[in-house]
Amino acid sequence: MDQAVLKAAQAALAGEHAAVYGYGVAGGHLDGARAGQAKEAYEAHRARRDALERTVRDLDGRPVAAAAGYRLPFPVTDPDSAVRLAAELESRLAGVYADLVGAATGALRGEAAAALREAAVRSVRWQGDGVAFPGLAERAAPAAPSSPAARP
């Protein structure tokens, strides 16, 4: 068994546990179409979580359990903060799925890539804009030198 694959699968599973919790919080502050989006995302993350539990077992691992509660990145008190939370959940999941894509091969890599794509699409739906490479930390481009380095 490849420990890197198992570790990445466990991280994705932990991310899905957090997403299920987070969407439970966010959904309580949304109504109408946004509440419907949150419910769909909640169900999708439950399904991914269940699939990842099977994957971890198939990798001879013991699936990481959900925490009793999760620290939210900011207070969620209204629809705007609930939408921000949903976008944050998806962005974080894109990161763990990018790691799983990098570690896995074959069918698991394909499943992780599909989950990464879905998280990126949901993130854009929640926040209205996307990033060039979902799941990869945005890095500032190095500054170009304005003049050649001085030579001794």
Predicted regions and their residues:
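All-alpha RGS (Regulator of G-protein Signaling) helical domain and cognate RGS-like helical scaffolds
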Residues: 1-152
